[in-house]
């Protein structure tokens, strides 16, 4: 199972670090994902949920 938010689809994205000389090196920006248990078809299931989804109330925990 990939580390992608079950509700919002947020996942790791890539970007660049920039120095004062404007040199660039690759970096990754990771979302704040938490493992939560939810009910799917009446059965408990563990999924990754972003902190933003948890705070906004999109997640109904068991």
UniProtKB/Swiss-Prot annotation:
One of its GO terms (biological process) is translation. Keywords: Ribonucleoprotein, Ribosomal protein. This is Large ribosomal subunit protein bL28. One of its GO terms (molecular function) is structural constituent of ribosome. It comes from Streptococcus uberis (strain ATCC BAA-854 / 0140J). Gene3D superfamilies: Ribosomal protein L28/L24 (2.30.170.40). One of its GO terms (cellular component) is ribosome. InterPro entries: Bacterial_rp_bL28 (IPR050096), Ribosomal_bL28 (IPR026569), Ribosomal_bL28/bL31-like_sf (IPR034704), Ribosomal_bL28_bact-type (IPR001383), Ribosomal_bL28_sf (IPR037147). Belongs to the bacterial ribosomal protein bL28 family. Coiled coil: none annotated. HAMAP family: Ribosomal_bL28.
